[in-house]
């Protein structure tokens, strides 16, 4: 699975390891990218401060949208790995209880060991062995 499919497609399954690695990477990477783009914006020295401010807001919105979309896709894929509907993402809108439930289900519990209705196991379990 390519990194764009991993981060921006809600289809398929991912294992816990990949879920945590991507969550940590994007939690660090998106703010770093945001501040790097803002620094670049400051170095360009646009003529109007209003234009600079508008571009800064647009950069912030794009970074935020990227973060949220990738978060949704990663969590939906973890629900799929647990053989549950991606609509369970909506449980995050229940304060505290929904957050804890999602953390335990998606971040701590193992996925379905073999193929399920959302695809084959990301660990390769339950598949035919192929010699060549």
Listing of model-derived features with the role each one plays in the protein:
Residues 1-29, 71-86, 105-132:
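Membrane-interface extramembranous regions at the lipid-water interface
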């Amino acid at each position: 699975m390519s990194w764009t499919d991993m981060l921006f497609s809600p289809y398929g399954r991912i294992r816990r390891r990949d879920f945590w690695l991507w969550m940590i990477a994007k939690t660090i990477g998106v703010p770093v990218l945001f501040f790097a783009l803002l620094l670049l914006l400051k170095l360009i020295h646009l003529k109007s401060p209003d234009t600079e401010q508008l571009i800064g807001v647009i950069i912030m919105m794009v970074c935020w949208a990227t973060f949220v979309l990738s978060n949704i896709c990663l969590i939906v894929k973890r629900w799929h790995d647990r053989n549950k509907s991606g609509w369970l993402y909506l449980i995050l809108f229940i304060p505290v209880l929904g957050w804890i439930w999602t953390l335990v289900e998606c971040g701590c519990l193992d996925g379905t060991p073999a193929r399920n209705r959302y695809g084959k196991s990301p660990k390769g379990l339950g598949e035919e062995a192929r010699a060549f």
